[in-house]
Amino acid sequence: FAGYEMPLQYKNGIMSEHLHTRSHAGLFDVSHMGQVVLRGNDFKQTAKALETLIPMEVETLNVDRQRYGFFTNSNGGIFDDFMFSNRGDHIYMVVNASRKEDDIKYLRENLEPLGVSVRNLENRALIALQGPTSQRVLEEHFPKISKMRFMDVSTIPIAGAECWVSRSGYTGDDGFEISIPSQAAEIVTTSLLEHETVELAGLGARDSLRLEAGLCLYGQDIDATTSPVAAGLRWAMHTSRLSGGYKEGKFP
């Protein structure tokens, strides 16, 4: 997938992995996705720069909160969609694997002239723990994980590694996405798999779960010719950025 060798399924098969994620917890390796850090002199500068590329409010995003976003092109289509979070002194983004090279180039071309650096994090892995028991699994490593709300982001220790964790996912279920230093990825993953409710799940189940939840996949459901309104993504565009809003326009 996108030039990466990825497991479509493990020994129990797609259906089993799908159902297990819905009833317990599935663990997905999504390290092929792009992880990017945007950093200006401060968050406000970085946020204002990113707002020149997307129809979302960035400046009002609270510290340690995450938001869904997408780039638009000059024809009103979607260049790519992604997640972004306010980490205090920088913005952390997760972009699609199939688009990450284009996204990073686009960000550099447009943000670096505004004084914002764009760093591709090639030294971190990314996994997703999804399903109703995922909180219970992580509580064994960090009991306060239960205080995290949907779309909260925090830095927590798992198996001795400093991990960046968001309460979010691509399944429509409760879950967490976990960015791990590459050298600790195997240790952290193995530790989570030791929990009796956790099983590995592949790309097949990831696709069926997101379809069941009605979540878009770039390149299949949305692309550069699809408008956000036609895609049912009007909810993601903030009123302040649209016609008549106090920050209207000024994005492609």
What are these regions (language model features)?
Residues 1-12, 86-252:
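Conserved, structured C-terminal
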Residues 14-23, 71-81, 111-114, 157-165:
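Short amphipathic beta-strand starts and helix->beta connectors
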Residues 27, 35, 68-70, 83, ...:
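Conserved hydrophobic/aromatic beta-strand scaffold that supports enzyme active sites
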Residues 29, 81, 177:
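Acidic active-site catalytic centers that drive phospho-/nucleotidyl reactions
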Residues 43-55, 79-86, 129-138:
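Charged, low-complexity, helix/coiled-coil-prone segments
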